């Protein structure tokens, strides 16, 4: 930060595998809501495509909790599949309902020229793609990608002072699995 002329600026690095963005957002929100800061900049970056799929898959497998998950043979797709199965059961949803999320996400990617996957897919495409970890199929899962994003989390007064258009956070949760 000193290279930018910013001194005495606290920073925090959060590593939470596939949940790093969500955990970082929540941490920033909690600090602003508690009144510790008026505004917090959350930035996330991932650069992995240069390493190749095999190396990246191996590396990511070390990011889980070895004692509780690794020894049981759990993988991130397996853990996400367990959560997806629980969701399907609790909300009486179908695998086609899950597939509609992938279709929506791909549709959003079509409007972004920098999206990793710019391909229209259908529910049938998702349903007929290879099973990764039931009920998740290939098109339900994200590929390793490079990307970055930032968001400013601030209190309402800061938002009003700096922008006429802002979004209010009306709900936020974090669960432990």
Please state what every model-predicted region is.
Residues 1-40, 47-79, 117-143:
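Conserved catalytic cysteine-centered active-site region
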Residues 6-10, 34-40, 96-97, 147-149, ...:
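Short coil/turn connectors at secondary-structure junctions
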Residues 16-46, 77-111, 151-157:
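Active-site-proximal alpha-helical scaffold in enzymes
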Residues 66, 90, 100, 131-175:
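Condensing-enzyme catalytic core mediating Claisen C-C bond formation in acyl metabolism
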Residues 85-145:
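Internal metal/ion-chelating core segments
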